A protein has these predicted regions:
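N-terminal targeting signals for Sec/Tat export/insertion, comprising classic cleavable signal peptides
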Residues: 16-51
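Surface-exposed helix-capping loop/turn segments at secondary-structure junctions
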Residues: 42-51, 126-135, 170-177
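Acidic/histidine-rich alpha-helical segments that form the ligand environment
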Residues: 104-137, 149-161
């Protein structure tokens, strides 16, 4: 069975050949990522937020090292911080929250609220992207120098961590929402 993410049913119907504004295009991507990310964050039971894979999780024939692997909660904290960071670059302003305050959150409730707030801030940033400024260079990050590219990277970066979180769910016997 396929979920909304696999079928594309989360996006509104558009007429092929219709011109979209940069913000509409970016919002489409961010909305899908937000829905999927928040879905996996909500799906993990609160008592499993401290879960991280270890060598003991796998067969003895595997020799991978797991030092420094983030817990499920730390994955949420990382993406939340990144959302604020990348969105602040689009807006050309200082991050409105201290990253250390996000990293200190430990409960599911706190982390879900922080993540939701970071997505709201990202939507605020995307709302400032216009046809005129989408590809004007900004003080970007890691070689990303336009609002449009940084906006796309919010989702691209987040999906990397979303994929890890999906595996954490499965390791704990939880079917990810996108697979239902």
């Amino acid at each position: 069975m396929t979920g909304p993410a696999q079928t594309g049913s989360t996006s509104a119907k558009v007429t092929v050949g219709t011109q979209m504004s940069p913000v509409q295009a970016q919002e489409e991507l961010l909305n899908l990522f937000e829905q999927e990310f928040m879905g996996v964050a909500q799906a993990m039971p609160a008592d499993k937020y401290g879960f991280a894979p270890t060598a003991a999780t796998f067969t003895t024939a595997q020799s991978a090292k797991y030092d420094g692997v983030r817990t499920f909660a730390q994955e949420i904290s990382h993406v939340t911080t990144a959302n604020y960071y990348f969105a602040s670059k689009i807006l050309g302003e200082k991050m409105p929250v201290d990253p250390k305050s996000i990293q200190s959150l430990t409960t599911k409730e706190e982390l879900l609220k922080a993540a939701a707030d970071s997505f709201a801030y990202a939507h605020k940033a995307l709302a400032t992207i216009t046809a005129e400024n989408a590809y004007t260079t900004i003080d970007g990050v890691d070689g990303l120098h336009t609002r449009s590219v940084v906006a796309s990277f919010i989702s691209a970066h987040g999906y990397d961590h979303y994929g890890q979180m999906v595996e954490y769910l499965r390791m704990n016997g939880v079917v990810p929402p996108g697979s239902k």
